[in-house]
Amino acid sequence: MKQIIIDPRLKYNYASWYLLGIKRLLKGWKIVYDVSPFKGIKYKNTADYNSGFAFIICSNGQKKKVFVDTEDVAKIFEDRYEWCDVYGMVNPTKEQVVQYDKLIAIGPEFGVTLGSRFSTIIRCLKLFLKGRKYSSISFKDYLRDYLYTNIRRRPIEAYECETKVRHNYIFHASTLWYNKFAATDTNMYR
């Protein structure tokens, strides 16, 4: 049986892009959210929660453990790297790509809305209950992350429409950051 097992303790806003990809690319595969195979990955604080998410690809009697690191900083989470067979990373350095054999540079991603606000709340509640024994993240923080996709993100269809190409125009999508450093540096370049 072809199956994807996903750790329910994922940061939904950052994982939504990849969840959409899994759903679209692996049509017909069974998708299961289960914390059991991921108990060894600790989620004790916000940094752990923000690190990314794990899933296992089961096909033809073989299993491949994948961790997707969605952090903006070029930091390898060693415990997650040791756990997985493939470590996908959004922002690695050239040196990291050479040094870490399991590391694959996957490029940027962005959060997308995957359903109505009601269905998102139901999904949040279900996945929180599945992973709560193995996470210190509060339900309030978990729910805030899920609802962020409905409040601040758009469905993928909003990005897939035909558009006229303007030769003197560069498309850039990002969110302004709300901290002291961002006000003086990052946001100025956005």
Residue map of PLM features:
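N-terminal pre-catalytic "stem/leader" segment of glycosyltransferase-like enzymes
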Residues: 1-77, 81, 92, 172-187
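Catalytic core of nucleotide-activated saccharide and alditol-phosphate transferases
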Residues: 56-185
